[in-house]
Amino acid sequence: MYQVIKRDGHVAEFSLNRISSAIMKAFDATHIPYAPDVIDLLSLQVTADYADKIRDGRIDVETIQDSVEAVLQRAGYAEVAKAYILYRKNREKLRNMSSTILDYKKLVDDYLRVSDWRVKENSTVTYSVGGLILSNSGAITANYWLSEIYDEEIGNAHRNADLHIHDLSMLTGYCAGWSLKQLIQEGLGGVTGKITSAPAKHLATLCNQMVNFLGIMQNEWAGAQAFSSFDTYLAPFVRMDKLSYNEVKHCVESFVYGVNTPSRWGTQAPFSNITLDWTVPADLAGQPCIVGGKPMSFTYGDCQPEMDMINKAFIEVMIEGDANGRGFQYPIPTYSITKDFDWSETENNRLLFEMTAKYGTPYFSNYINSDMEPSDVRSMCCRLRLDLRELRKKSGGFFGSGESTGSVGVVTINLPRIAYLAKDEADFFARLDHMMDIAARSLKIKRTTIGRLMEEGLYPYTKRYLGSFDNHFSTIGLVGMNEAGLNANWLRKDLTHEETQDFAVRVLKHMRERLSDYQEQYGDLYNLEATPAESTSYRLAKHDKAQYPNIITAHEGGTPYYTNSSHLPVGYTEDVFAALDVQDKLQTLYTSGTVFHTFLGEKLPDWRAAAALVRKIAENYELPYYTLSPTYSVCADHGYLAGEQFTCPICGRKTEVYSRITGYYRPVQNWNDGKSQEYQDRKTYQVSGAAQPHAAAPAKEVKETAPVSGNADRYTLFVTATCPNCRAVKPLLQKAGVPYEEKDAAQYAEEAKALGLRQAPTLVAWGEEPTLYVGAAQIKAFLREYAQ
């Protein structure tokens, strides 16, 4: 006899009497007479209706109840079916009432005794009274989301582990990127009843404001907070005060220590990210610098020497680590690797790649072969939403976000379960569509909810500096593509096999197409993410093993977990290029956070080896983000130790072993059971003997600036109401005497769409053929030629 999976995940033996009893109650409610034989016949028809849905000797109670409704309808008992539906709704209300009651004693005891896996759900939250407070409030908030905000189907999908709704413990959005330029122009404050700081005039003041800003915003968001163009925007402050290198380093040091102070809820440091340009970006080079909230007489393009000082100081602080030699967890820096990147043996290059080799700190954005542009981190608010089916790519790094963008929430789909339950590939996609529909609806509900709460004043600083969530994505991710291949009865192979790789490509393309549908349906931005899944990969596998004992997880016979997103099994190969060849065709299909981690057993021999590997990956692959991730250890007395050493070889004391868990470094002792098992299973890549990449990426076309149209009859400037670059180019056009007509792209959407506009500002020169100057940089290039 088979078993029934209840809504709370518990399993009970099947009983035909329970079906018969429910049907009789529905008949009694309608006062329609019935014979016992009729009830028996209907009950048997119900079991026949769901028979083909039984998997591994189990079926969920919702499927049985759906069959009861269907059988009653087909048998002509429409009124009885209505009564049964009402019976289900009443039962739902009772469940919802009971689900809002928390066992406070168990909640606190489980945390204090570390008997609940959720105590280590997030490795950044240490066992502490702050962690206890977060655990208690998080349980209440999660209950509120699942019982009071989301409908039963969404709540059940999460509780039953069909999918995972992230950050239920917070009544906030997920992650956000902020405009550092806005903070420099406007200062910190502007919220009623709170202290306001004027725009910073000195680097030390700005560093303090950034620390405070990130700490404030972290309390209004669940995940990462990001600044873009960190080095570019800070450089003018060095120039204005003619600061020495030691003075610059002292300011940067105070910033780094400040953002690593556990000032956030849960005794955590703010999850902070910064992108560094390394060289002045073209779209900023000609803009006047802002210091003290006012434009200066010099431009960002004049400040490359000061940028070099900022970068040198930041890297030296990160390399030195804290007083015990421990690497700094934050901020997570992302560096842009462009075609023009200078690979020569400069001092800053040596420092950058020494930091990479020793601590694995930076992320690298691949602008050589990927379809991204460095200016993307600043242009999101300028993008025109004319084609609702166009999927945009989130900028700003794996965890970070570009200026004024981010994500309202993330939902991860449990792919191995779908594959395990599916009869064939067609059934797999039907089930995937259903789960994605639930995920998309939950994200729409969350967006609406937090949008209303922001208007009501729950997130005062977000309201002040952001204003709306219009440029924030609704994010859908996935976990366990590797195990989906193993559980799919038409494959039975993991991602190391070409058949499963081809299947993964079909799945990712199908999910992208589905996201375009949701953008049309809901009018919001959606993106596809390779979810970090720090705890999700463990939670979903743990649930699946309890409900479906024969399902295949990443570690059979031990602690179960699923492989992150569409990554290869962690113990597959030591050949980094063999892994890259497979991942390159998969990671380029995501439109949100995705990264290739080059896990290394210990630090590389020198900085040149790190630089060579970073360059080789960027020049030969198209994947957007990657890291070098060496394992290292820290002894309280003897500091940094290369590689995994659980005891100090000098004094024999217990050490902290650091590795990258999902995207950031934490001691492996703090990891949850699933990720700890993954760490044990993981093979590290051998680089010293690595040959050339197995597959070289084709060269990309270089985007050319539009030629100046000298015989234009007229000009039209397309703008948006919220675009800062639009406001910047208008006075430049007027000063140059360009006779232009201004049009709001939203009001003239059809005309803008016909011209193929994707970004504001865009200047159209009308001649025999319209010539487009897209973005502030191209418009400024046009003006230089126009003046001649």
Predicted regions and their residues:
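Intrinsic, low-complexity terminal and presequence regions
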Residues: 631-650, 656, 660-712, 735
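Core structural elements
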Residues: 67-72, 278, 460-484
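Charged, amphipathic alpha-helical regulatory modules used
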Residues: 1-106, 468
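Thiol-based oxidoreductase modules, predominantly thioredoxin-like and allied folds used
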Residues: 738-750
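Non-catalytic, surface beta->alpha helical segment in thiol-disulfide oxidoreductase systems
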Residues: 765-788
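Structural micro-motif
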Residues: 1, 753-764
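Conserved catalytic cores of very large enzyme subunits
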Residues: 90-94, 100-470, 491, 497-650, ...
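Local sequence-structure signature of Cys/Sec-based thiol-disulfide redox active-site neighborhoods
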Residues: 705-736
